[in-house]
C-alpha cells in the first residue's frame, strides 16, 4: 500500500498549520479520495471513511454557524474523534475555537489554504493521485517524441540511451534513462518519470554520465510523461520473423493496462532514432483513425476485385 504524508502535502500545496501536532510530518495519507464532511457534521457517520482528508469549505462553515454553541462543539468533536489524517479549511476562513481545541486534544492536524474549495480539491486530488498510484520500476528509457511518450525497453547495451541521445539532438525530449518509474494514475493512463536521483541524466558508454538539462537546455527534458507506446529493442535474430506489414497490433500489459508495443530488431547500420520517430508518428496516426497497413490491404482487395470482374 502506497502512502504520502501530511507533511508532504503541506510543503507541496503551501498549507498553513493552525495547530502544532508532534507527528505531523509522519502522519500517513493512504486514500486519494477526499471528503467534505457535511453529513458527518449532522451526525451521520455510516459509511464514513476515516482514511480520507477532510475538507471544510464555505458551505460547511456556514452550516456550523447555524448551530448553537453546544451543537457546534459536539459536531466538531465527533469529527476529530475519528482517526482522520487531517482537516483542511479552505478560502482562508477563520476556524471556530472548537476546531483548534479538538485538533490539539486528539492530535489531528488542522490546516488552512487561501484557495477556494473546488480549485484546492482539484489540486490536492491531482497530487494524491500521483503519490498514491500503483507503480513499478522498469529498466528502460522514456522519451517524448512528437508528443508521444515512447518507452524503450531492451537488454543492457542494446542502444536505448544512444537512441535517446540522438532523439534529443533531433529536438525531442528526454524524460528518464536507465530506470523508469511507471505509475497507474487512472484505469487507462500510465505515467513514467525518472527517480529523482538520476533525473535528467543519461549514461553513454565510453563517455559516462551526461546532464542533458545542462548540455542541451531545459527544453530538452521533462519530469514526467504519459506512456503511449512501448518499443522493445533487441539484437537482430536471423531465425526470427519480424513484423513487416503492421496489420496486427501488439500490446504489452503494464500494471493491468495494455499499451501498444513494437519489437524493433537492432543491427549495425540501422538508424534507430529515425525508426523511433516514425513509429511515434505512426502510432499517433493510428489513434487518429488511419492505419497504413489496413489501407494497403483494402487497396489490394479493391484491385483484386476489379481484376476479377474483368
From Swiss-Prot:
Pfam families hit by this protein: Hpr_kinase_C (PF07475), Hpr_kinase_N (PF02603)
Important for the catalytic mechanism of dephosphorylation: annotated segments: 265-270
Catalyzed reactions: [HPr protein]-L-serine + ATP = [HPr protein]-O-phospho-L-serine + ADP + H(+); [HPr protein]-O-phospho-L-serine + phosphate + H(+) = [HPr protein]-L-serine + diphosphate
InterPro entries, A to Z: HPr(Ser)_kin/Pase, Hpr_kin/Pase_C, Hpr_kin/Pase_Hpr_N, P-loop_NTPase, Ser_kin/Pase_Hpr-like_N_sf
Nucleotide-binding is among the record's keywords: yes
The enzyme's E.C. designation: 2.7.11.-, 2.7.4.-
Chain residues that bind ATP: 154-161
Cofactor or coenzyme needed: Mg(2+)
Record keywords: ATP-binding, Carbohydrate metabolism, Kinase, Magnesium, Metal-binding, Multifunctional enzyme, Nucleotide-binding, Serine/threonine-protein kinase, Transferase
Top-level division of the source organism's lineage: Bacteria
Residue numbers binding Mg(2+): 161, 203
GO biological process: regulation of carbohydrate metabolic process
Active-site feature positions: 139, 160, 178, 244
GO MF annotation terms: ATP binding; magnesium ion binding; phosphorelay sensor kinase activity; protein serine/threonine kinase activity; protein serine/threonine/tyrosine kinase activity
Stretches for region Important for the catalytic mechanism of both phosphorylation and dephosphorylation: 202-211
Family, as annotated: Belongs to the HPrK/P family.
Assembly mode: Homohexamer.
Further remark: Both phosphorylation and phosphorolysis are carried out by the same active site and suggest a common mechanism for both reactions.
Functional description taken from the UniProt entry: Catalyzes the ATP- as well as the pyrophosphate-dependent phosphorylation of a specific serine residue in HPr, a phosphocarrier protein of the phosphoenolpyruvate-dependent sugar phosphotransferase system (PTS). HprK/P also catalyzes the pyrophosphate-producing, inorganic phosphate-dependent dephosphorylation (phosphorolysis) of seryl-phosphorylated HPr (P-Ser-HPr).
Domain text: The Walker A ATP-binding motif also binds Pi and PPi.
Protein's recorded name: HPr kinase/phosphorylase
Organism: Caldicellulosiruptor saccharolyticus (strain ATCC 43494 / DSM 8903 / Tp8T 6331)
Gene: hprK
